Amino acid sequence: LLKRFDLFSVVRDDLNYNGGNMKSWEIWGREDEPANSSWDGWTKLITCNSFKPSGKPVGENTDEDNAYIGKGEKFDFPSGIPEVRYIRIKVLDSWSGQGYVQFSEFTFYKSE
């Protein structure tokens, strides 16, 4: 079972909490291989929101903001989610609100 994941955003002074870095998203999963791109058979596992320590508007970052995003954000899956083999990410919003998404890495961890 999935336990948690880390999101590493694209880290650059002009892109921290900006651009296509994800602000809110959902992670969906399923055990069997999907036959097509339909959402049928997928289960929502978690809804996530990126956290900006200062709460300042887009384009205004503090040293604390930059340090926080540089370490990667950590998220715990809720208990009771089903076992999954396939992951799908549905982006709800980016920090700039533009129609593209960027990230450096997702790292998923399973329960021991």
Task: Locate each region found by the language model.
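Extracellular carbohydrate recognition and processing domains
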Residues: 43-76
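Aromatic, loop-rich ligand-recognition surfaces of beta-strand-rich domains
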Residues: 1-40, 69-112
